[in-house]
């Protein structure tokens, strides 16, 4: 996938900026089961993102999950309950890249569409952070509407099969548009 909002929602050269401004961290651990991150332009939320990514990371983390709302809607009526993910590959900006991969164990519950996913910016806004903190990890980015029926089942599989993988919920703090993911992660 190609970046769609580089230079608009975050700066060109974002990884270089983060590498020099985001300090190496020790002693602060990722506190699960998930971390909530905003999806807004860096001009509005960079200090919140800096705090959200202020934790020590394990370079051996193999999988990261980013769960986000689908704002644009679905392609056709029979997919109104779908959860979407981009095709496996990579998302790359001017000086960063992340590997996109949906684990096979949940692939059957998801519709794949680069077109739909490229209209959402929730992953791209935090991708430079992910490239700094989890340089070797595969990222599974899932988009859903509040009506998506597979959200609960997908979360159950993620929690069971990937207990040590960081989970980020991209949420607008004012509208709570990712509430379905938060609800599914409640014990």
Where on the chain are the PLM-derived regions?
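Active-site histidine-anchored catalytic micro-motif
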Residues: 1-187
